């Protein structure tokens, strides 16, 4: 960059009640601790996380600019990235994990690029990538679908569409669910997917009570555990099968 703007650092957040130094590299923490300006989704929770990271500056002296995710497409450059324009570095932080993946932070990054502000992603935990790594499914071709519809028949159709897409493209399909609906989601997967289709559920990633189970729907039908209120990533993988059995 040839201008005198500050840099926009993409700051990883924790995925749960984990010590920052256990999941975030020392080099990343060193950069984050020096920052004085942050774009965040929620000031209260962000203050709490940054306090755990051990900021160089008093937390009350740090500026927080909240991103209105319901009106994120109408961003104001000076309001959200004014510090960068004045030559100071800023951080963009998600509510959990890495920014701009399954959250509205990408719009801030797009705004920064348009203004000529250098964007620097920092290393940290990402639930989707960790789940994919641990699933044993295809890591060469995969897609993230966010949240599936809540009500049927849209939900049922979405689940079957994931299976068809996975089989047609030899692709791993990832999505997330509101934690209190996890058990209902697993039931819907068992009802609508072929018994040979494989599903991985990765809960509480990086935490002490982390749970990762990867098995076929036929095996999931015998599962007696409780997934309720555990932040989770769901993965569906249906390899091309020789059998002609498939949902119409």
Each PLM stretch: what is its role?
Residues 68-69, 76-119:
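Glycine/small-residue-rich loop that forms an oxyanion/phosphate-binding "nest" at active or ligand-binding sites
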Residues 2, 6-10, 88-89, 168-248:
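A contiguous loop/helix-start segment that scaffolds small-molecule binding in enzyme catalytic cores
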Residues 1-69:
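Glycine-rich, flexible N-terminal cofactor/catalytic loop recognition
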Residues 15-17, 95-99, 179-180, 239-242:
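Short glycine-rich anion-binding loops that position phosphate/pyrophosphate groups of nucleotides
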Residues 65-72, 148-152:
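Conserved helicase motor
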Residues 39-40, 91-99, 172-177:
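Acidic beta-strand-to-loop metal/phosphate-binding motif
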Residues 32-38, 116-120, 172-173:
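Short active-site oxyanion
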Residues 9, 103, 107-165:
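Class I SAM-dependent methyltransferase SAM-binding "motif I" and its flanking Rossmann-like core
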């Amino acid at each position: 960059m040839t201008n005198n703007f500050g840099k926009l650092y993409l700051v990883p957040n924790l995925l749960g009640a984990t010590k920052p130094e256990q999941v975030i590299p020392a080099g990343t923490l060193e950069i984050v601790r020096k920052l004085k300006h942050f774009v965040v989704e929620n000031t209260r929770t962000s203050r709490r996380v940054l306090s755990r990271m051990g900021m160089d500056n008093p937390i009350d002296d740090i500026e927080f600019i909240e991103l209105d995710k319901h009106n994120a497409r109408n961003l104001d450059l000076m309001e959200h990235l004014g510090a960068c324009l004045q030559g100071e570095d800023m951080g963009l932080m998600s509510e959990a994990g890495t920014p701009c993946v399954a959250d509205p932070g990408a719009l801030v990054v797009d705004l920064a690029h348009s203004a000529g502000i250098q964007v620097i992603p920092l290393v940290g935990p990402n639930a989707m990538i960790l789940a994919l790594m641990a699933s044993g499914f295809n890591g060469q071709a995969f897609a993230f679908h966010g949240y599936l519809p809540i009500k049927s028949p849209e939900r049922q159709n979405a689940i079957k569409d994931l299976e068809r897409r996975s089989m047609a493209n030899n692709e791993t399909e990832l999505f997330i669910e509101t934690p209190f609906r996890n058990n209902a989601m697993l039931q819907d997967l068992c009802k609508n997917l072929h018994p040979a289709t494989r599903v991985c559920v990765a809960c509480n990633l990086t935490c002490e009570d982390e749970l990762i189970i990867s098995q076929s729907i036929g095996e999931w039908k015998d599962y007696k555990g409780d997934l309720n209120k555990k932040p989770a990533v769901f993965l569906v993988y249906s390899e091309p099968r020789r059998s002609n059995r498939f949902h119409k």
